[in-house]
Each structure stands twice: as structure tokens, then as C-alpha cells.
From Swiss-Prot:
This is Sphingolipid C9-methyltransferase 2. Belongs to the CFA/CMAS family. Its EC number is 2.1.1.317. Catalyzes methylation of the sphingoid base component of glucosylceramides (GluCers) at the C9-position. Sphingolipid C9-methylation requires 4,8-desaturated ceramides as substrates. Glucosylceramides play important roles in growth, differentiation and pathogenicity. The methyl group at the C9-position distinguishes fungal glucosylceramides from those of plants and animals and may thus play a role in host-pathogen interactions enabling the host to recognize the fungal attack and initiate specific defense responses. It is a multi-pass membrane protein. The keyword Transferase applies. Disulfide bonds: none annotated. The chain crosses the membrane at residues 60-80, 85-105. It catalyses: a (4E,8E)-4-sphinga-4,8-dienine ceramide + S-adenosyl-L-methionine = a 9-methyl-(4E,8E)-sphinga-4,8-dienine ceramide + S-adenosyl-L-homocysteine + H(+).
Length: 521
């Protein structure tokens, strides 16, 4: 089957998501705030807040960066050029010093959550005596220092990674480090400024063409790398149920009907394209830069009898998307636009607007961040940019996205925030990953396993607590001739979309809950 389909590396199995292990630490009673007990998610045992934007003053920082070079220039009798010279020399060191100092001395946002104060050594096992002596008791280790040491094998968790990370406020500091600032200034920012086409291609293919088994070992048989949707908070739905819920929600929110021309930008392994084609009769074009994903998506559609004339996956840059006469009736983009970058975001939206039929619908699922940030959020974001999604610099607060969408000419019909749904999805991905530990380490090494272990565990927490989140935004063109009345019956929230489901999810699940990729391809 691998030769016939053009897909390689199918000699792996999907696992059934295992139960979460018993917590390694005694249950914390009366932590100071109410906690939840829902089966659908990994409930937070210690939901503490840290310091952040409420104690950070941009005006003071800008004043320092402006006044100090001017004062130095004045002292030597210089003018504007001399001031500019001193700014080049002293502003970066002052900026770093400011970040290091303020992030270290700022108090927690509130003290509502009572920390157990067990000491760093209760949670971490350092390999070197110097580290054991340095980080113990209340002398907490900076988060960036910790994860770099963890990836290098210089420290281990005393227990399950996710469980120890849940207690992180008791053993870690979120103050900035020299390494974090260095990466931001000289690693991330140049990419944000440049963000070239070749950079996009290199980063996407390095990430997504690593190996289908690498992703299959945590994504499961749906091979969907975006948030699922919870339909019932009082039971633990499977990962596959969460993803099937999401597929349904997308198709119902856009009012998909048989024969609709649909474009899925950043389609991944093509599961949404196949679902929309098979369950709704749509004519779908999926676009991805991943070669492995292209082969997988086309093979899976041919397997179930969807002809290429109806639907296909193409391996192209989004800037080269083929457009049919009249445009696409429905356009979807799930967690791809963040990779476009801040520099190109408006031009990307303009392109989508131009490709969309005047009475069409655009659905954007967008991973964003909160505006009232905490230092933990920034530390996590820089980790993600360095190790997981390099170049995905357009993860922003909702207001920024809405402003760009409306400025491009879209009218927003509905917005749902699905961060906690993402946490539920990540929790299941994490358990799959841990269950495949031996296989991952044997093929990709312990370092790659640890990076993804940390990513999946930490992101389960981050998306649950609001540091990062995800938005579903449904839009039409904001022009006078748009038939807005046609969209009234499909102006759904999450549960409205699920209640209106026109897909045969039972049949879909029966065909797709498989043990090996070969059964799909």
C-alpha cells in the first residue's frame, strides 16, 4: 500500500489513548480558590497566577531608552547623530537589563492560590552536584534554564511531566534569562522582520515532513494537528470524538452543501478535506507545503472513492493557490494563518478576500494569546517559537485579529473561544505521546521525545489557563450585495453546530478508527 499510495513510513500503529496515571503528589486541599473536577479535561490542582503586564510600564521603558542616549550625547556636546550613535550602543543592554530586573522583582498578580512550598528538590532531580546545590528550597530555577537543561538530560522530573508541571509555581521562576532575551532579539525578531517565502517553505517542511509516524504517535488515526471540540464536559470523550466534533462544527458553521467549492488553506493531512467531501459532497481543494501530508491526503481520499476531479490536496505555497472562475464558495483555514507572520498577515487576508465568492463564507481557526499577559506566557511563547513552530509569529490577541479582518473587508458573523477545548485535545495528545515513548526514542532520540513531552504537557496547562487560546471566527464579505439573510440559519455557536450535524458520524468513525495507517491509505 505504501508504494501504491506514494506514502512512506507506514509501519507504525496508532494507540488507543491510555488512561492518565494516578497523580504523583498528594491531592492539594483548600488551595485558596475553587478547582474543577470535570472528566473532559485535565483539571488544574494549583491554578496560581504570576506577575505580568499589570506591573510592566512601556512608557517608563521607552523614556529610559530615549533619555539616556540623549543625556550621554548632551554630556559630550553632540547632536542628533551622536544621540543615535549612543542609542545603538546602549539601548540593547539597557533593554535586556530592564527585562531581567522587572521580570525578577514583579510580584504575583494575586496571592489567592496558596503554594505548598515543598522546595525545588521535591519536584526535580538534578544530575550535577552544582545544580543540586544551587536550585533547592525556595531558590527556584528559571523556566528557560530548566527546559534547556531538561532537553540536554541534565535534570529529570520526579514523577510524570504533566503532574510536576502542574505544580510549577512551587519550583520555577518565570523571570527572563540572558538566553531568552538573546533568542528573542537575535533569533526570533530577524525572522519576524524578514519572513520570506523560502523561510516558510524550509520551516514547514522541516517540521511537518519529519515523519508521519512522529505525528501519528500522538495525533492518532485522525491525523489532525488542530484543536478538537468538547461536546460533553461530564464525560471523557476520546480524542477521535473531539476531532469529529470539530470537523462537524466547521462544516456546519460554514453551511457546507453538496457541490460547494471549498478551499482549505493549510490542510495538513487532509482530514477535513476528506470529511467535507465524503460527508457533505463538497468539492475541496486542500493546500499544504508538506510533501508527506499531500501524499497522505490524496491517498486517503482515493481510498474511500473520492475522485481527484472532486477533491484533491496540492503541495503549494498559499500565495500560489489556484482559483476557480468565480472564486471559492467556502474557505477554511485552521491554525495556519499564524505561520503567515505579522508582516504578511494583511496581504494573506486580502488574498483570501479576493478568492472568496461574494456570497461565500470564510472560517478562520486562529491560535492566539491574551492581551493581559503574564511573564509565563512570554516564556512559553518564546519556547514555542524556538522549538515547535518557528516562524509562527502572528499569534496575537483577538482584538488585533478582528481589526485586521474588518480592515480587509470581512464582516464577522460569530466568534467562539475554544482554548479549554484545545487543552482537552492536548491532554489526549500528551497521553498518546507518553504511551509511545520507547518507539519515539528509538527512532528520533531522547531529546526530541523530551521536547515534545514538555510541549504537550505545558501546552495542556497554558491553553486551559488562558495564556494561549484559540478562536473560531466565521465571516462573510462586508459588501452591500452580500446575501446576509442566507447565513441566518447557520449562525451557530459550538453546540448549535453540533446539534445541526448532517454528517453520519457513526459511519465515519467506524471507517476511521483504525490501528494502522495502511487501513486509511
Amino acid at each position: 500500500m505504501a508504494e501504491k499510495s506514494g506514502v512512506t513510513g507506514l509501519d507504525f500503529e496508532f494507540v488507543k489513548t491510555p488512561a492518565f496515571p494516578k497523580p504523583d503528589f498528594d491531592k492539594l486541599e483548600n488551595v485558596g480558590v475553587p478547582t474543577t473536577r470535570y472528566p473532559a479535561i485535565k483539571n488544574a490542582p494549583l491554578p496560581a497566577d504570576g506577575s505580568g503586564s499589570d506591573t510592566f510600564n512601556n512608557y517608563v521603558l521607552i523614556s529610559i531608552l530615549t533619555i539616556v542616549p540623549w543625556w550621554l550625547s548632551w554630556k559630550v556636546g553632540g547632536g542628533f547623530k551622536t544621540t543615535l550613535f549612543f542609542a545603538i550602543i546602549v539601548d540593547l543592554p539597557m533593554l535586556a537589563a530592564w527585562w531581567l530586573t522587572i521580570s525578577a522583582i514583579s510580584p504575583r498578580k494575586n496571592e489567592k492560590v496558596r503554594l505548598p512550598n515543598r522546595g525545588v528538590e521535591h519536584y526535580l532531580e538534578f544530575k550535577k552536584e552544582a545544580d543540586r546545590a544551587k536550585y533547592r528550597g525556595t531558590n527556584k530555577i528559571p523556566m528557560e534554564t530548566f527546559y534547556e537543561m531538561y532537553f540536554d538530560g541534565d535534570v529529570d522530573f520526579k514523577g510524570d511531566c504533566l503532574e510536576v508541571m502542574e505544580q510549577r509555581h512551587d519550583w520555577v521562576s518565570f523571570r527572563f534569562t540572558i538566553g531568552l532575551i538573546k533568542f528573542f532579539l537575535f533569533g526570533m525578531m530577524p525572522e519576524v522582520i524578514m519572513h520570506t517565502r523560502s523561510q516558510d517553505e524550509e520551516q514547514v517542511r522541516d517540521h511537518y515532513d519529519r515523519g508521519d509516524d512522529f505525528y501519528g504517535w500522538f495525533l492518532g488515526p485522525r491525523m489532525i494537528y488542530t484543536s478538537g471540540i468538547i461536546s460533553d464536559i461530564n464525560r471523557e470523550e476520546t480524542l477521535e470524538e473531539l476531532q469529529d466534533n470539530k470537523l462537524t462544527v466547521v462544516c456546519e458553521k460554514i453551511g457546507l452543501t453538496k457541490g460547494d467549492s471549498m478551499l482549505d488553506i493549510g490542510c495538513g493531512w487532509g482530514t477535513l478535506a476528506r470529511f467535507a467531501s465524503e460527508q457533505y459532497g463538497a468539492n475541496v481543494t486542500g493546500v499544504t507545503l508538506g510533501r508527506n501530508q499531500t501524499a497522505w491526503g490524496n491517498s486517503s481520499m482515493r481510498k474511500v472513492g473520492i475522485p481527484e476531479e472532486q477533491s484533491r490536496i496540492v503541495c503549494k505555497d498559499y500565495r500560489d493557490i489556484p482559483v476557480p472562475v468565480g472564486g471559492y464558495k467556502k474557505i477554511t483555514s485552521l491554525e495556519m494563518s499564524e505561520h503567515v507572520g505579522i508582516r504578511h498577515f494583511s496581504s494573506f487576508l486580502k488574498q483570501v478576500h479576493d478568492m472568496l465568492d461574494d456570497d461565500g463564507v470564510f472560517f478562520l481557526q486562529y491560535a492566539g494569546i491574551r492581551k493581559a499577559w503574564q511573564y509565563e506566557d512570554l516564556t512559553w511563547g518564546l519556547f514555542m517559537n524556538k522549538y515547535i513552530f518557528p516562524g509562527a509569529d502572528a499569534s496575537t490577541p483577538l482584538g488585533w485579529v478582528v481589526d485586521k479582518l474588518e480592515g480587509t473587508g470581512f464582516e464577522i458573523k460569530h466568534i467562539d473561544t475554544i482554548g479549554v477545548h484545545y487543552s482537552a485535545t492536548l491532554w489526549r495528545w500528551y497521553r498518546n505521546w507518553m504511551d509511545n515513548r520507547d518507539k519515539v526514542e528509538a527512532k528520533y532520540g531522547k531529546r526530541w521525545f523530551r521536547i515534545w513531552e514538555f510541549f504537550l504537557a505545558y501546552s495542556t496547562i497554558i491553553s486551559r489557563q488562558g495564556s494561549a487560546t484559540c478562536f473560531q471566527i466565521t465571516m462573510v464579505k462586508n459588501i452591500n450585495s452580500t446575501h446576509r439573510i442566507d447565513g441566518v440559519e447557520t449562525q451557530f455557536n459550538l453546540h448549535g453546530a453540533l446539534d445541526n450535524c448532517r454528517a453520519d458520524l457513526q459511519s465515519w468513525a467506524a471507517k476511521n478508527n483504525v490501528k494502522t495507517p495502511s487501513e486509511l491509505l
